Amino acid sequence: MSLNNRWTVEQRYRRLEQIPQCDIEEMTLSRQQDKGFPSFHIAPKFGLLNDPNGLCYFNGEHHIFYQWTPVGPVHGMKYWYHLSTKDFIHFTDHGVGLHPDQDYDSHGVYSGGALVENNQVLLFFTGNKRDQNWNRIPTQCFATMDSDGSIEKHGVVIENEHYTEHFRDPKVWKKGDDYLMVVGAQTKTEHGSMALYQSKDLKTWQHKGPIKTKFSDLGYMWECPDFFEINGQSVMLFSPQGVSSSNPYDFKNIYSVAYIVGDQLNLESMTLENHQDILQPDYGFDFYAPQTYLDESGRRILIAWIGLPEIDTPSVTHQWAGMLSLPRELTLKDGFLVQTPLPELKSLRKEEVVFAQSHTLESTSCLIQLDLVGDGFELELSNLKGDNIVFSATEHEFMLDRRYMSHLYAEEFGGIRKAPRLDAKQTIDIYIDNSVIEIFINGGKHTMTSRFFIDDLNKVTLKGLEQARLFPLKGITGLFESAK
C-alpha cells in the first residue's frame, strides 16, 4: 500500500516553506539513524527522491537534478533538487534548483531533461497544475541556468492539445538546426506513446505525433522518455506502465523500463526505421525512470531512480525514500545497451579482500566480483538470524531472491527476479550499499537493481565458486551541505 493513501491532499502538497523546522529536524534525525541509508549513492536528506532530471555536463561538472518531495517520504509537491560533481565522489549540494512558484507549476515541477547550448543549460520540465476539481493541467515548460548557477524560468512552451492529462517528462536534443523534444504521453485511446515535437527557436513547437513502432499497443502510458543516438543507431528508452509478460523474465514489476534500437528516426513518416524487438535493461526489483546525457568526452551516461511509483519501501519509517543508481556508461553491442559503472567509481575502493565460502562483513558498503566459468553458484547476504537475500545462477539463468529479508514489501509482485544468462564465462560486479544492490551481468547487457532490507547484515556466503574478490567502498562526500 502506498503512503499516498494515508496522507491527505493538503498534507502531501505542503510547500517546503510551510514545513515547520521541528518537523525537518525530526525527519533529518530519523534518516540519520537509519542503518540502511546508503553511503555511496545519492539519496535525499529527508522526504522522497524519485526521477533523475536535467542531467548534463556543464562548466567542467556533471549536473544532477532529481525530483524531491520534502514534506515526507510520499509523492506530493515536487521540486528539482540540484547537485554537481567533477568525479562522482565529491559533490556540491546546490539545494533546490526549481521551485513550484508559478501558476503553471502550482502543484509541482515535474520531470524533464537538459540541453547545454551557448554557455547555458536549457532546462525543460513539466508544469503540473490542478484545477478546483483536481483535474490535471500539464504543460511543457522551459528554464535556463547560467554559468554562475542562477536559474530563470521562461514559462510554458507547449500546451497539451493532443493527449490525455498524462503528458509529461520532456527530453530535448538538437539535430542540425532543429530542436527535437520527446514527451511521455497517453493517447486519447489510452495507449502509451513517445510524442515528438520540433522547433527552430525553442519557443514555437510543432507537434509531429507519436513515434511509430510495432509496439504501439504496449501499455497505457510511457513515462520518462529518452531518445538518443549511439554507434550510429537510434535508441528509444522509456518507462512503460500497464505491461506484463508470460515469459519468466520480462515486466515483472508494477512498472518497468524498456528500450528499442533502430536505424534512424524518419521525421516524415514518424517511424523508427528497422527497429528490433523491445528489450529491458534491468531485471531487478527497483529500477525506473532512467535518463541519459553526454559528458565532455562523449560518453553516454545513464542514471536511474532506484524505486518505483506506488511502492513504499521500509525506509519510509525513517522519513526518506528513493535513491539514484550509480552512473553507468552506455555502449551498444550485439543490439544490447551495455551498462558499465563509470571508472571514476574505482576511487571508492579500499584494500581488496579475497574470500572463499564465507566472510564476515566489516562494511555493508562494498563491491564483490565473481568470475564465472560456466557452473552455477550462490551468493548469500545474511545476518545472525538467517534473514537473507540470495543471488544465484544456473547454466541458463540468474536469480535474485529476497523472500527472506528482515522487512518485506511489494510482496504482491513476487520475491524472485530472473534474468537470462547469455555467456558461460563472465565477470560479475555486485555493488552493495547497506540497503541496495546493483548487479552487472552478461557483460553489462543486463543489470539487476534492487533494494533489500536485512537488519544487522554481517555475512556473505559463497557456494559453487572457489573464491570471490571483495572491496570495501568509501562513501561519497558533499551531500546535505547546502545553505539553501
From Swiss-Prot:
Biochemical pathway: Glycan biosynthesis; sucrose metabolism
Catalytic-site annotation from UniProt: 51
GO molecular function: beta-fructofuranosidase activity
EC number, as in UniProt: 3.2.1.26
GO cellular-component term (any): cytoplasm
GO terms for biological process, alphabetical: sucrose metabolic process
Catalytic activity annotation: Hydrolysis of terminal non-reducing beta-D-fructofuranoside residues in beta-D-fructofuranosides
SMART domains reported in the protein's UniProt record: Glyco_32
Alphabetized Pfam families for the sequence: Glyco_hydro_32C, Glyco_hydro_32N
InterPro entries: ConA-like_dom_sf, GH32_Enzymes, Glyco_hydro_32, Glyco_hydro_32_AS, Glyco_hydro_32_C, Glyco_hydro_32_N, Glyco_hydro_beta-prop_sf, Suc6P_hydrolase
Record keyword Hydrolase present: yes
Binding-site residues, substrate: 48-51, 67, 110-111, 168-169, 223
Subcellular location: Cytoplasm
SUPFAM superfamilies per record: Arabinanase/levansucrase/invertase (SSF75005), Concanavalin A-like lectins/glucanases (SSF49899)
Alphabetized UniProt keyword annotations: Carbohydrate metabolism, Cytoplasm, Glycosidase, Hydrolase
PROSITE patterns: GLYCOSYL_HYDROL_F32 (PS00609)
Induction: By sucrose.
PANTHER family in alphabetical order: BETA-FRUCTOSIDASE
Family: Belongs to the glycosyl hydrolase 32 family.
Function field: Enables the bacterium to metabolize sucrose as a sole carbon source.
Protein's name according to its UniProt entry: Sucrose-6-phosphate hydrolase
The species this protein was found in: Vibrio alginolyticus
Record gene name: scrB
